[in-house]
Amino acid sequence: FSPGDFDGDGKSDMIVRDSVGGLYLFSGDGAGGWKPARAIGNGWNIFDSIIGPGDFNGDGNNDVLAREPGGALYLYPGNGAGGWLPRTAVGTGWNVMNALVTPGDFNGDGNVDLLARDSNGYLFVYTGNGAGGWSRSWMIGVGWNALKYVGAAGDFNGDGLPDVYGVDQQGRLLTYYSDGRAGWKGSEAVGAGFGWFTAIF
């Protein structure tokens, strides 16, 4: 996954995990390639979901959220140089969610937020408080279990707001356009034939 600029050099980076739980940082070289990988952690195979929300605690550095199968959610704050500050627990019971999406600032308050889908297809927004925790949460959609994949699309339509993508059971790629207030102003199919992919980022 991409945490954004994780080492503070102004270039986007990539973090990968191997089969034994080793975590590695591939720093972007700014020209479409990578600098040599370096190890930044071990034991990360205890997590079933690892995502890069951006700067979740408001210190100017990009961070990582990781969930254990038992539902505990942890914040690993980045130190701005490709390493970590001490982790903090930011939630329990997150194992009821089968998709975690990091769209950035979804409600327009300047803080990073999180979207989560449960097994019944309900989609929730968890608004960040800008200090490594949550301000509130509420449901913003139903029927999202009809989608095989859900993810953050960035600003897909150029209106300055973060959007969300989904792939349905027929393989259609759908874009859901944010209204900037933790809601939607429309959706449309923007592609087909995406059903055979095993992962979409």
Question: Which positions does each model-derived feature cover?
Answer:
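Trp/Gly-enriched beta-strand/coil motifs that build multi-repeat beta-propeller-like domains
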Residues: 1-201
